[in-house]
């Protein structure tokens, strides 16, 4: 399995270098050119690995297998639901959430990210994905850790930027109320 990932990572790095994908405009052009030619998960991986600010923004992206494990461990929800994705990044959780809840009458998803460029790229990707009619997405270019929420949510799911949380009490609260798939 490591060999496959290593080969995949080498391919991703070659693509990033070949298309100069550390540049925002080049990423947009890449999405427009290759959206129908490459697997969507592969494009998302390319966006994740080409983010030059990932260290600064504590942008550590979640592998799709972990996202799937987390989604498989959430409770069954019915009716109209509201979901918060506090650190959406390039949308790997978001796309899986949309699929998982496509059968419900109404799904309202609020997504947050501090990276303006990654949100713009995510919006471009979502224009190319046929979203179910039941799904509405609101984008917030804000740090959810300092945002004052007016709504409650049925589900909060994602991989928040724990590296940014310096206060141990706050970090412990997030860990206490979250799901850790390693010890469920």
Go through each PLM region and give its residues.
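Class I S-adenosyl-L-methionine
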Residues: 1-103, 110-125, 129
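A generic structural signal for alpha->beta connector loops
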Residues: 80, 106, 134-136
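Short linear functional motifs in flexible/disordered or boundary regions
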Residues: 82, 134, 168-170
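S-adenosyl-L-methionine
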Residues: 124-147
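SAM-dependent methyltransferase catalytic-core segment centered on the flexible catalytic loop
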Residues: 52, 88-108, 119, 141-184
């Amino acid at each position: 399995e490591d060999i496959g990932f290593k080969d995949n990572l080498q391919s991703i790095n070659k693509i990033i270098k070949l298309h100069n994908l550390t540049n925002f405009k080049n990423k947009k052009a890449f999405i427009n050119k290759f959206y129908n030619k490459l697997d969507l998960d592969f494009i998302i991986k390319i966006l994740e690995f080409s983010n030059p600010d990932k260290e600064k923004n504590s942008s550590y992206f979640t592998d799709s297998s972990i996202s799937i494990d987390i989604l498989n461990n959430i409770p069954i929800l019915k009716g109209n639901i509201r979901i918060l994705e506090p650190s959406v990044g390039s949308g790997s959780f978001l796309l899986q959430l949309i699929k998982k809840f496509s059968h419900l009458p109404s799904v309202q998803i609020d997504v947050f990210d501090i990276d303006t460029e990654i949100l713009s790229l995510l919006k471009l990707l979502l224009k190319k994905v046929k979203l179910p009619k039941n799904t509405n997405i609101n984008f917030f270019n804000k740090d959810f850790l300092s945002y004052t929420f007016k709504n409650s949510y049925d589900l909060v799911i994602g991989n928040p930027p724990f590296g940014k949380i310096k206060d141990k009490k706050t970090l412990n609260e997030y860990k206490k109320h979250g799901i850790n798939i390693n010890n469920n």
